[in-house]
A protein has these predicted regions:
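Glycine- and acidic-rich phosphate- and metal-coordinating loops
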Residues: 35-38, 68
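ATP-binding/phosphotransfer module of carbohydrate and carboxylate kinases, centering on a glycine-rich
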Residues: 1-35, 56-58, 78-85, 126-252
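Cofactor-binding loop segments of dinucleotide-utilizing enzymes, especially the Rossmann-like FAD-
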Residues: 41, 70, 216
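Phosphate-binding/catalytic loop of phosphoryl-transfer enzymes
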Residues: 44-139
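Alpha-helical substrate-recognition element adjacent to the catalytic core
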Residues: 10, 39-45
Length: 252
């Protein structure tokens, strides 16, 4: 069962409670959970009490309720109860040092304008830049523009004037993945991942630990991620598109 996304940073308590009441509870029928473990983007420390309160009202018979951020979800999914380094690589990117129970260190990702190395948004930014500055074959540029119906003016407008520019840039990933046989394009993907290791993972000073990753970019570009990890002196651990299966194992 699933609902629309819940982000306690962007949504207020009333909105979240409505989502749970209208989208989750009807699907659960007579199921009475013994424990609820909520993990979500935007679930910072100052939002934990709010989320636990909302869930407590929705499930008054539940004995155990926890709310945590998506970074801990990724760490528990790929590392389980072992010490390790965990990364999120989707539209955005993040990473942490994990001690087998909690996040003990986190290099701030800074978003796709200032950081987010290894993310789909940054990959898209590199791709568009390389296309229009002659760093990739001209036929690749022509094919992409024809396939998407975009032009330079439209792209500039989407990036600088429309909302969710990060998602637009990340949407180039599908085309990039289909053309990895173009050598400079694959090298761009590998270099984007290498920058993630250099700028973020290296800060933990733990090349002895395996690096696991969650997210669509990590999952679909696993081969390139493995090349980048090896080039930077790391060993790649588990890679998952979604943390759900790993979290089920962790809490079982």
């Amino acid at each position: 069962m699933s609902t629309q996304g819940i982000n306690p940073f962007h949504q207020d308590a009333e909105n979240i409670a409505t989502v749970i009441e209208e989208e989750l509870l009807p699907k659960m029928g007579n199921i009475e959970p013994e424990g609820i473990f909520f993990y979500g983007s935007g679930c910072r420390e100052d939002k934990v009490e709010m989320m636990c309160g909302i869930l407590g009202k929705a499930f008054p018979q539940c004995a155990r309720i926890e709310a945590q951020g998506d970074l801990l979800a990724a760490a528990r999914a790929v590392c389980g109860e072992r010490e390790g380094i965990a990364c999120i690589m989707g539209t955005g990117a993040n990473s942490c040092l994990y001690d087998g129970n909690r996040v003990v260190e986190n290099t701030p990702p800074l978003g796709y304008i200032l950081g987010d190395e290894g993310s789909g948004a940054v990959l898209g930014k590199l791709f568009v830049n390389a296309l229009f500055k002659g760093q990739l074959p001209s036929e690749l540029k022509d094919e992409w523009l024809e396939e998407t119906g975009l032009s330079l003016n439209i792209i500039i407008n989407k990036v600088y004037r429309e909302p969710l520019a990060n998602r637009f840039l990340a949407s180039t990933s599908r085309f990039i993945h289909q053309h990895l046989s173009v050598e400079p394009l694959e090298l761009m993907v590998v270099d984007n991942f290498r920058e993630h290791f250099r700028c973020n993972v290296n800060q933990y000073g733990r090349k002895d630990l395996k690096v696991g990753a969650v997210g669509s970019v990590a999952y679909y570009y696993r081969e390139q991620l493995e090349k980048a990890a090896a080039a930077e002196g790391y060993s790649l651990g588990k890679v998952m598109r979604s943390p759900m299966d790993g979290l089920v194992r962790y809490h079982s």
